[in-house]
Amino acid sequence: NQWQPSTDGVGSAENKISQTTIADLERVSNFLKEKYNYDPGAYQNFGNSAADNYKIMARIDWNISKNHKLMVRYNDVKSQDDNLVSGASTPGGVRLNNAGRNSINSISFANTGYKQENRVRSITAELNSVFSPKVSNKLLASFTNINDTRKTDGDLFPFVDIMRLGSDGKTYEGYMSFGTEIFSFNNGVLNNTFNITDNVTIGL
């Protein structure tokens, strides 16, 4: 998070200083810890860490015999990326009247963020067989597992936006946010795909 809270309530877009004060953030943090035993996380000097990813690839080629050849290939790709809370949207589709939950108007606590985790594992096997000069066969089988999920830091807690009256005296704008990111709990895509193809070639 590039935005930092202010000491005097004066924001600066150039210096990434929010109007949200350290005193207010500290007051809310202490209240949540004492009243609900909930730690909302840091409110400054936190942010997106570097994306973490790895790839594992392995392949085996086996000449079973002169007429039968087997290939097995395995791929495993995993990536993880830290993200700040969604900038302005709410479950009801209402948009906050500011530049986001981390902006010149507002600061969100660290535990409002989420981790996007994606893992794809697949295994493929191919068996090529020659039964006679005129008959051959290719058997293909594959299995793919896709796990695309979100994880949140901290304990589960209702997401809260603290609003305040804007400078125009008519509309409310975000000032502070804490709790579990509203679109991340139990949000995930799990897919398992299995394919088998058998091709027989007969020469005339």
Named regions from a protein language model:
Residues 1-6, 14:
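Glycine-rich (often Gly-Gly/Gly-Pro-rich) flexible segments and glycine-rich loop motifs
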Residues 42-45:
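Surface-exposed cleft-lining segments at the edges of enzyme active sites
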